[in-house]
Amino acid sequence: MRLYWTPIAMGHLRAAYEYVARENAAAAETLVEQIFAVVERLEQYPRMGRVEGTRELVIAGTAFVVVYRVEAERVEVLAVLHAARKWPEEF
């Protein structure tokens, strides 16, 4: 199954990187690498997660959650959210 990042999700990831990089650029790089590494697992195991219509993937060791949905031929990454943030209305 292919993995597709929506522009919104990439914007969330970019914002998380920029926020962390203000204090520690190396930590920001590590965070993004860790998120990508975990999300790549969705290609083989797309049914991880728990919300009907969407699923959530907690990035261990961070405060981030990746929201995604499984389509016929791809896994669509919808958002990268900090766990302390208010959950968006569309989810």
Which functions belong to the PLM regions below?
Residues 54, 63-65:
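Short hydrophobic/aromatic beta-strand or adjacent loop that forms the aromatic wall/cage
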Residues 65, 69-91:
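Enriched for short, Lys/Arg-rich terminal
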Residues 2-54, 71, 90:
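Basic, Lys/Arg-enriched alpha-helical interface segments
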